[in-house]
């Protein structure tokens, strides 16, 4: 039966969200209910956020399961599935690929109370990777510790990744009217969203039930993102569909948006702290092709290290003088900053978390 542990319960929900089957099991024991509202407010909020994310990821999950059915490539794959020649791929059994675009590194350890962070040792494969939640950038081909608050689980998106999500808030079985795509820089990418009509019995990949919408990114020299008009069973998707395009980890750029070659207006916003550019397109015919161009290309961007350090230090249960001295070292020093931090603070988790941000973007 185990014992109540709100923190671990929140971590297990996070793991469940990035698993093939996500269910909250309990027993006849009246104390073992797993509904989020049975836990403390922090755990309840975290569970709710992750369960809503799971619902948003249905287009990604459904497409991954279609791929598993027809191509034999499972949703969850061990590291050695993709990197059989790498020794490290056999040494991290709890780390796994989740679909074609993501790498999941679950945390199941308790947070260190002073730092209010928990850590997990990870191997990051070659290439450039982006944290799906906090936008940190990692250069792969190495092992490192990843530290997160209880609100976060390390999930990394590869360069060029495209993650489709549903933004429909009401429950239902229909395909979404509002979609989002999280688009990560640094490489070309493509993702075909598979949907079905919810009625026709499936008898093969090419039967009449499927609708396919291809999303593609050309990163350089001139950045271009395309949503192709739906192919196949067009009746399976809404006639009109709204899109929210999130270009992650980029410098601000001015987009030109066209639908079948005709310019249309988009609502554009930029988060300079998280370095995310967002375009919102309303009521676009699903059968028409949308193209977003950035005339001068786009540049990859990373969050300011001092801002990241401030977030970590502001939460830490240590003296204010130490916090100020550590932040000053992050701002003024580069290669020697870690040595200075180690001379100021003895908490290895806190020092490790600061080391992660000092080196996560390749600096």
Regions found by a protein language model. Name each.
Residues 267-290:
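A surface-exposed beta-strand-loop module
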Residues 198, 265-268:
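Intrinsically disordered, low-complexity segments enriched in glycine/proline and serine/threonine
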Residues 263-264, 300:
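Extracellular or exported targeting regions of proteins
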Residues 2-255, 260-261, 287:
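Catalytic core of carbohydrate-active enzymes
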Residues 294-363:
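Mature N-terminal, pre-catalytic/accessory segment of carbohydrate-active enzymes
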